[in-house]
Amino acid sequence: MSDDRLIVALDVPNVVQGLALAEKLGDAVSFYKIGLGMLTGGGLALANELKQDHGKRIFLDMKLFDISATVEAAVRGLAQFNLDFLTVHGDPHVVRAAKEGAAGSDTKILAVTILTSLDRTDLDDCLIRDGEMLDLVAERAGRAFEAGADGVISSPHEATMIRALPEAKGRLIVTPGVRPTGSASGDQKRIATPRQAIADGADHIVVGRPIWQHQDPRAAAQMVVADLP
């Protein structure tokens, strides 16, 4: 049986490989993330097929960031695909525009706080102001919630802190950077196990390579689900 707290990242090059992986996973997975890499290889068509023909839930990870009118128009168009989750950057004007675009649909707008592939050194390189990572994430999450975000994307390390924010009541926390015990961290820097991420307050976890690079992806997904509290 699947558990929709697990979202599998379809970080493969094209639709053919994406469908092949989804077929291998079968009913062990009910929720998929499609990111920018897949979008250039027919990702919207894949999202539509998985949603309409296979009954899967879809998280489109686009991290939209533009002027308000452009974000609103883009989200309005994407919402026609009956997406479950859609990501935008957490700037308040972006979140508000995305919510306007998603109005009338069931698409949840999730705001990115700070990418799980970044640490304080990376933020310094990007000229992002000084401060502890936890404080910066809390500030961005709070502003996104105030702007109307249905949830946020954060590393597992910040999930407990975000869950404690008054503004977070009834909102979603989705955590990439989740690695089963013994898995390589890859390009993620702020990571946790599936069990720890959920215990710390995440509603959903995103797992990619530890599943789709496994010799038996279905078994790998089932092991992740078995580890959830």
Curated annotation (Swiss-Prot):
Keywords: Decarboxylase, Lyase, Pyrimidine biosynthesis. One of its GO terms (cellular component) is cytosol. The keyword Lyase applies. Signal peptide: none annotated. Belongs to the OMP decarboxylase family. Type 1 subfamily. Catalyzes the decarboxylation of orotidine 5'-monophosphate (OMP) to uridine 5'-monophosphate (UMP). This is Orotidine 5'-phosphate decarboxylase. It comes from Jannaschia sp. (strain CCS1). The lineage of its organism: Bacteria, Pseudomonadati, Pseudomonadota, Alphaproteobacteria, Rhodobacterales.
